[in-house]
Amino acid sequence: MPKWSLRRRPGRTLGLLLLLVLSFLVLRRLNWSTLVPLWLQHQRLGLRTKGPDFILEDSIFQILGGSIHYFRVPREYWRDRLLKLKACGLNTLTTYVPWNLHEPERGKFDFSGNLDLEAFIQLAAKIGLWVILRPGPYICSEIDLGGLPSWLLQDPDMKLRTTYHGFTKAVELYFDHLMSRVVPLQYKHGGPIIAVQVENEYGSYNKDRAYMPYIKKALEDRGIIEMLLTSDNKDGLEKGVVDGVLATINLQSQQELMALNTVLLSIQGIQPKMVMEYWTGWFDSWGGSHNILDSSEVLQTVSAIIKDGSSINLYMFHGGTNFGFINGAMHFNDYKADVTSYDYDAILTEAGDYTAKYTKLRELFGTVSGIPPPPPPELTAKMVYEPMSPALYLSLWDAIQYMDKPVTSETPINMENLPVNNGNGQAFGYVLYETTIFSSGVLSGLVRDRGQVFLNRVSIGFLDYKTTKITIPLTQGYTILRILVENRGRVNYGNNIDSQRKGLIGNLYLNNKALKNFKIYSLDMTKQFLQRFDMDNWSVIPKELTFPAFFLGALSVGIYPSDTFLKLEGWVKGVVFVNGHNLGRYWNVGPQETLYLPGVWLDKGINKVIIFEETMSGSMVQSTDIPHLGRNQYIN
């Protein structure tokens, strides 16, 4: 057989090389062949508009979308949730991108594990879903500071969501990194991304007319070539419009549907209509009720939107969980922090189970497309485990010695400006302030969000938004004054996001005299924080407990680890960690009564459970296979 070489067979070799290149390009495109008919695969026109219709290549395309946030769902369950979205008859996935989680410190990016955005998008494509990406930089999404990193607030003059130089400089560096990851996943490059949203609901903020054109240009300059969209509620719709960007609307009630045909038509003429967020339920706040939206009402409204010829995205299709401390808050008349569960009364439950909404909408979407949707995946197994009684204990005051050395400062320093985490401040968790006092009197100060006040180791009350003063009783000699301040969640929506600094804000006063000389401990409750506690540091639970305190126990799991929900009857307020995973906050004010524990985070055999309790502990932690999210309240 002859020995082939470039020298001896240049024509043949060149032909083979061209064939290989062509094969690579075809195979690259065929990775997405489940998304559209094969005869469209050679096209590169992408999503565009033609009169009242979306056109994908040469075909009219109605977007039937659903929102799932990869950062609120364990990675091991991404496939299950996306298959359920596809099986509901939907053709498009939408997701936000949280800047604060992807860049926890300036220039330090994290797209690994549960934050692997590229893997999530590629998985959606393999399952047969288009993707609409919503990269912000602000995303709202009931997440801390609307997804903006807290280190931005180190600048005392910071003006978020404007063309203020300190903000735009940070946005550009973040977009440089983010867009390098997502640009290759656009449709015209062979990927599933058919559209990208410019910021989020800016019409309701509208502090800088140059800002939205700036964000549009920032996206385009970094290679975004697919259709651009804006997203606003009906009140902010007109103010959120950007030249060359398709406006879409967010709504819930059938009474708001008129805006589809009136406001949208008036601001952009005959263009495709899309409800970018049809709110399938609502989020919950601590101290409130569990909000629900009747499935029949959901079906009626979605049917009306479809009948109108509009495209739609279900927000949320699957809400998931605010694991850790990522929940946001609202602050209009009162400050209200969001609960750990982001169940949202969505189409799938927090744990990914089917609902009446799913059954009804699957039938509707199957009728719309004329093609029976694929069969739904089986339910994820649930399990009730034996109750767990903590065996070991470590009071916060004894734990301090194992923490990093405190910051010393003449005056209090807010959380974001603490010289920790390589100069990026502290984003989440608690801060402990400590100073010495020599007299009694009235203690006052600005505490954000909730501060438990101690004399030595004895709790004497709380300071928060409503309680700004507390009486210090008469003491002999000097006393150590301690305030444990919790960041309960930065506001994610509204005009006051610039003022979301946490901890002690400004001076702390005793009898109107500023206190000095503080020790400040950062209690961010990360995995690294908890790893400081060796087994030798723990002790058997004593008869007389001192709070706050950490409790250590073991959850025994059989051969097949499965999802469960932890119920903390008798416990008051704190955080639960299982095998290093922060499940989130619990609080007996409700409405949420159980914490979701994914089975994929459990090991066969013994599982390590740590509870940080602020006030009073129960005797055990129970497991149940049914979530308890509180008393239902129908959304008006």
Swiss-Prot record:
EC number(s) recorded for this UniProt protein: 3.2.1.-
Name of the top EC class for this enzyme: hydrolase
Secreted recorded as keyword: yes
InterPro entries: B-gal_1-like, BetaGal1-like_ABD1, BetaGal_gal-bd, Galactose-bd-like_sf, Gly_Hdrlase_35_cat, Glyco_hydro_35_CS, Glycoside_Hdrlase_35, Glycoside_hydrolase_SF
GO biological process: carbohydrate metabolic process
Family (UniProt): Belongs to the glycosyl hydrolase 35 family.
Name recorded for this polypeptide: Beta-galactosidase-1-like protein 2
Annotated source species: Mus musculus
Lineage of the organism: Eukaryota, Metazoa, Chordata, Craniata, Vertebrata
Gene symbol of the encoding locus: Glb1l2
